[in-house]
Swiss-Prot record:
Any one biological process term the GO annotation gives: negative regulation of DNA-templated transcription
Family of the protein in this entry: Belongs to the BlaI transcriptional regulatory family.
Sites where the protein binds Zn(2+): C133, C135, C140, C142
Pfam families (alphabetical): Penicillinase_R
Function: Acts as a copper responsive repressor. Binds to DNA in complex with Zn(2+), repressing the transcription of the copYZAB operon. Exchange of the bound zinc by two copper ions delivered by CopZ Cu(1+)-bound form causes release of CopY from the promoter, leading to the transcription of the operon.
Localization of this protein: Cytoplasm
Gene: copY
Protein's recorded name: Transcriptional repressor CopY
Lineage of source species: Bacteria, Bacillati, Bacillota, Bacilli, Lactobacillales
Induction conditions: By copper.
GO CC annotations, alphabetized: cytoplasm
Length: 145
């Protein structure tokens, strides 16, 4: 089955499960529980509940192998990360996006390759003269009432 290219809103706990499945390519509930048991202190029942939600949201698809269900990603990790980032930026003033990106770069631990990729994108970027505030009046400093 081909991965979807749409944003599926998932909770922080569901992200943890998806990260395991994206890494492994496919997994059953026991495998996921083993990987997340120490850090999350989850039991199999918790993982199965999260898997059920992810299947319902169409983030995963399943196949049955004997008595076990094997879970496969139905959404791309990179597309979901990109969509989550766009969603984050939609919640802040457009005039703050650049400063927010700069803050993220400042806080992140980066390799030389990471820095080169960021610099490459910045060098290709054409600046605009001004950025218009996209907030409702009263939501930011730009449009104080």
């Amino acid at each position: 089955m081909e991965e979807k290219r749409v944003l599926i809103k998932i909770s922080d706990s569901e992200w943890e499960v998806m990260r395991v499945i994206w890494t492994l390519g496919q997994a059953n509930a026991q495998q996921i529980t083993q990987i997340l048991a120490d850090s999350m202190d989850w039991k199999v029942a918790t993982v199965k509940t999260l898997l059920g939600r992810l299947v319902k949201k169409e983030a995963l698809w399943t196949e049955q192998e004997g008595k076990k269900f094997i879970y496969h990603p139905a959404v791309s990790e990179m597309e979901n990360v990109r969509s989550a980032t766009e969603n984050l930026f939609s919640h802040i003033c457009a005039k703050r996006v650049g400063a927010t990106i700069a803050d993220l770069v400042e806080e992140a631990t980066l390799t030389q390759e990471d820095i080169q990729q960021i610099m490459k994108q910045l060098n290709k970027k054409e600046p605009v003269e001004t950025i218009e505030c996209n907030c409702i009046p009263g939501q930011c400093e730009c449009k104080k009432q």
